[in-house]
Amino acid sequence: MSGAAKQAMFAQRQIIVEQQMRYFAAGICGLIAIFVILHWTRALYSRISRTSSSPIPFAAPFSAVTRATRRLLIRKVPRFNSGGHALLVAAYVGINAAVCFTNVDLTSAGNVAARFGWMTTANMCFVVFLALKNTPLAFLTAYSYERLNCLHQISGCLTFVCMVIHAACYTAFFMGKNQRALLVEKEQIAAIVAGFAFLSVTISALVIRPIWYELFYVVHICFFIVGIVCACFHQPDFGKKIVIILILTAAMWFTDRVIRAARALYYLPNNSATVHPLPHGGTKIVMKKVPTRADGGKHFFVWIPRIRAFEMHPFTVVGTQPLEFIVKSHDGFTRDLHKYAAAHPGATLSASVDGPYGTFPDPIHYDKIVLIAGGGGASFTFGLAVNALERMKEGSNTEIVFIWTVKQHDNLAWFTQHLETLRTANSPGIVNMNLYVTRAPVSPPDLIPHRHTDEQGTGHPGHDRTVTMSSTSTSSAVNSPFSPTGADVDKYPVKEKSTTLPPITHPRSTLSSDIEKEMEQRVEDATAAAVSATAGTRTSVIVANPPERHTDSDSERPRRQHKMTAGRPDLGTLIREAVQSTPRNQRVLVASCGPQSLMTVVRDTTAGLVRADGPAVELHCEQFGW
């Protein structure tokens, strides 16, 4: 082929590939537009239905179609968070396949390599867009960056596959043409370095991330920077326009970093974090400053230079007056933070935050809020509950059903103050607490065992809620990840015993981290006595409430008690009871945070409750993503 013919061929290929990139951009933008339209249509419909006193025309067919669709899409499917996630990934992969294999000469390795090189660049731009912490999609679609992480990982892997095909085809093409010398040119050396850099990025995400998150983060960021710079040197010609896409990609990433750094520096002066150790590796962080737009349930990236000078870690807001985080110790930063808090309880450290981040339905717009948490996931549900209570108007009939499962009794100490806040909240809403301890062979000092209600309905005077607690829960059989224990206990006659243990003696106004320390100590001191007193018996328990400083208004308000049950909850039944007891003209929010097994039960159960003849049900799952 002559030089002129070759130039004409390259020019024609450039025109075709640029047109294919426009198709790719149109496909991705169309995918985003679907979510934008659906989000704002549902938001507008919900707003009109809340404010309108008369039926909305065509509302019934619209509601029936959307609910039938959501009933299918929010269910858990293997390898994906939900059916909706799987459908989104399938659409994204389909767009890539269509752009890769249309209008291309598949018999020429050079043409195939060029097409996949362009697709690598285009997908890399999309990968970075999905990773932006300050993403516009959080406003346009109500999906913030952590909820986009699933697609970010899929698109990252697909980008790497495109890069490998690009490199393999061009290598085969040059070797077949006996042009090995081209492989040692500086542009190709830059490409080889970029390839290994992106290989390191991919390995860090797939292999290192589940094992050592901090190492993953450092490798991910450093090798991404190396890869993007080397890719620019690989295609430096602005006429080919690839470098323009790469510069745009780098600019997006850099701008997001500048915004985050500026926000952290803005909140740094005169700011500090007070750290308190909690039982079983927990740490409480209390910030001096409360940033604007801080709401319970959202999360901030916390920077404590004394623990890690160059790291910021995301934690969920539990309370905003003051700004408070509850941190579970794993390894790295959280482990060192807990060690420091244990060695210096109540220490004050210079700190700052970046945020808030996270999107979820506004709880104030629902008639019933069902919150389910497992272990440390209660940081989200406590934050959401307090968020709703603080904003409820006088006369509101909103009900909050709070379900929390923990492994140990003293895990409850992590949220002692917040449990007390929900119990004594001067709010028109109703808070129905359901606490479950899965490893609870004995009653802790904060539980006062008392005689179970008899068949005539007589119970412990002065208490409005009781629940049966089986002290043999540690050996109970479990049919599902969250099935109840001791279900057949009432079939057999058992001997009842009553043992009174000292309640918390702190007044409400002095509840602090000392409560957690005292609770942990009393649990250890009382264990032996409680085992002998409760072994083999059935015991109803209530949480002993600390004495309070009462006012006239306090004395008129009935005291709430927290339901406490040993064993795993039957989440499916609890959720169904909460939703099915709601009138069909009302709205229910089901929000959960916890391990994958819990989230699967919540998803599948809630999906079955999304019906045309039932209340409007909204599901929000706050997945562990870090």
Where in the sequence are the language-model features?
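FAD-binding FR-type
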Residues: K284-V370, E390, R549-S553, L609, ...
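Canonical alpha-helical transmembrane segment with a positive-inside/aromatic-interface signature
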Residues: I247-M287
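Reductase modules of NAD(P)H-dependent flavoproteins
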Residues: S2-R13, I225, F325, H330-T334, ...
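Membrane-embedded alpha-helical bundles of multi-pass integral membrane proteins
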Residues: R13-A25, S54-V258, Y266
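Classical protein tyrosine phosphatase
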Residues: G117-W118, E146-H166, G374-I403
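Extended, low-complexity, polar regulatory segments
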Residues: M1, F35-L73, V541-R560
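Hydrophobic alpha-helical membrane-embedded segments
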Residues: L31-R47, N123-L132
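Non-transmembrane, juxtamembrane loop and terminal tail segments
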Residues: T51-R75, S272-V290, V442-H463
